[in-house]
A protein has these predicted regions:
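Non-catalytic cap/lid and distal C-terminal segments of serine-dependent acyl enzymes
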Residues: 4-262
Length: 262
């Protein structure tokens, strides 16, 4: 799972901005039974922006102020103006796993394989609710999806399940998940022009767990598969540290890559 956010307060304030920054308004709501937290730049009347959806739990939701603060000065300059929308799953091990799999240890829950339902809801009623409620540009070309850890696996799984997003970022994704690389190799992406960003910490493959230590080789293989399958750019970025290091910074790099003006 994504680590705790290190004491970052929940982002429920109405407005926050640093010196010289674009003000960002926050609001929370329920869509398809899942809590959504949206951070919106202070658009002019009638103006709309792109959307970066973040799959994750409460710890990721509480990182939103840090992410916005790191990126807001670049909006409208090197980055397209965009909203950050965190979607909290009903259950991490259920909704971010593509199929059922045994627990990693006696202390953790088994994976129950509800990933298809989560992505159907995300690409359907959740997107619909967000685009009706928020000043967002419609269409897949204006939507991106990112996730960390098991949510990063879910994000890459979305490449093969939905056409709703034009850019995907699997950040320190759990590509050790049993059978996932075989699935990638045997399955065609829904849209070959989807841009995909992968990243991994350079110490993540040094895990003591025999399954999790495969994450390095699997991620290297995944980028090769993507380069063969896709017509749009894809990239693999290596970060310093293990799975729980620099989470906010890694997410910022991924969002920057997806939202950068070309």
């Amino acid at each position: 799972m994504v680590p705790p956010s290190g004491g970052i307060p929940p982002a429920h304030s109405a407005l926050f901005a640093g010196k010289g920054a674009v003000p960002v308004k926050w609001q929370s709501f329920i869509a398809a039974g899942r809590e959504c937290m949206a951070g919106l730049p202070d658009f002019a009347p009638g103006e709309k922006g792109k959307a970066v959806y973040l799959s994750g739990g409460d710890s990721l939701k509480d990182r939103l102020p840090q992410l916005e603060q790191a990126l807001e000065g670049e909006m409208g300059k090197t980055l397209f103006p965009f909203a950050l929308i965190a979607v909290t799953p009903k259950s991490w091990e259920e909704e971010f796993s593509p199929w059922a799999a045994p627990a990693l240890s006696r202390k953790t829950p088994a994976f129950t394989g509800g990933g298809n339902e989560y992505l159907r809801d995300l690409a359907g009623p959740i997107l619909q609710e967000c685009e009706e409620r928020l000043p967002l540009l419609p269409g897949r070309e204006n939507r991106a999806l990112a996730g960390y850890s098991l949510a990063g696996l879910s994000t890459l799984y979305a490449l093969y399940q939905t056409e709703a997003f034009s850019a995907l970022a699997s950040v320190s994704g759990s590509l050790w998940f049993e059978g996932f690389l075989d699935y990638m190799e045997k399955t065609a992406p829904r849209c070959r022009d989807t841009r995909v960003y992968l990243s991994l910490g350079n110490k993540e493959e040094k895990s003591r767990h025999p399954l999790m230590r495969q994450v390095g080789d699997n991620t290297r293989r995944a980028i090769e598969v993507l380069e063969a399958q896709l017509t749009a750019p894809c990239t693999l970025e290596w970060n310093e540290g293990g799975h729980f290091d620099g989470v906010t910074q890694r997410l910022c790099r991924a969002i920057r890559w997806m939202m950068e003006k070309k």
